[in-house]
Amino acid sequence: MPIGPGSLAVIAIVALIIFGPKKLPELGKAAGDTLREFKNATKGLTSDEEEKKKEDQ
């Protein structure tokens, strides 16, 4: 069930109401940093698995 543009707009408006315009950029930055760290960690796991497969061959 994908999130469409209408749903994203509703989520953004609710977040703006709850957190206010001053706090929202800080929350966005924190979410982006967390997502970036997660992607880097999973990328590291994937490359470790690929190296292990190459060693096994």
Curated annotation (Swiss-Prot):
Protein's membrane topology: Single-pass membrane protein
One Gene Ontology term of the molecular function aspect: protein transmembrane transporter activity
Protein name: Sec-independent protein translocase protein TatAy
TM stretches of this protein: 1-21
InterPro entries named in the record: TatA/B/E (IPR003369), TatA/E (IPR006312)
Function as written in the Swiss-Prot or TrEMBL entry: Part of the twin-arginine translocation (Tat) system that transports large folded proteins containing a characteristic twin-arginine motif in their signal peptide across membranes. TatA could form the protein-conducting channel of the Tat system. Required for YwbN secretion.
Similarity remark: Belongs to the TatA/E family.
Self-association and partners: Forms a complex with TatCy. Two types of complexes exist: one composed of TatAy and TatCy, and another composed only of TatAy. Cytosolic TatA forms large complexes or aggregates.
Something else known: B.subtilis possesses two minimal, substrate-specific, Tat translocases: TatAd-TatCd and TatAy-TatCy, each one composed of a TatA and a TatC protein. TatA is bifunctional and performs the function of both the TatA and TatB proteins of Gram-negative organisms.
GO cellular component terms, semicolon-separated: cytosol; TAT protein transport complex
Xref: Gene3D superfamilies: 1.20.5.3310
Keywords associated with the record: Cell membrane, Cytoplasm, Membrane, Protein transport, Translocation, Transmembrane, Transmembrane helix, Transport
Protein localization: Cell membrane; Cytoplasm, Cytosol
Species per Swiss-Prot/TrEMBL record: Bacillus subtilis (strain 168)
HAMAP family registered for this protein in UniProt: TatA_E
BP terms from Gene Ontology: protein transport by the Tat complex
